[in-house]
Swiss-Prot record:
One of its GO terms (molecular function) is structural constituent of ribosome. Belongs to the bacterial ribosomal protein bL28 family. The lineage of its organism: Bacteria, Bacillati, Bacillota, Clostridia, Moorellales. The gene is rpmB. This is Large ribosomal subunit protein bL28. The keyword Ligase does not apply.
């Protein structure tokens, strides 16, 4: 299961409920992007959620 390397966000599980109220298990996955980051001055690839990218918690390598 993929996890955001910054905030630790991961997929959550719950029920998918049909119109006839039949419940089946399903997962909601975070929107993860594989980006190149600067970690201690060296570029590294990591999976980061889009919330961390938008909020500026990540310094991207170019």
């Amino acid at each position: 299961m993929a996890t955001c390397s910054i905030c630790g966000k991961r997929a959550v599980t719950g029920n998918q409920v049909s119109h006839s109220n039949i419940k089946t298990k399903r997962t909601w996955a975070p929107n993860l992007q594989r980006v190149k980051l600067l970690v201690n001055g060296t570029p590294r690839r990591a999976y980061v959620c889009t919330r961390c990218l938008r909020s500026g918690k990540v310094q991207r390598a170019i």
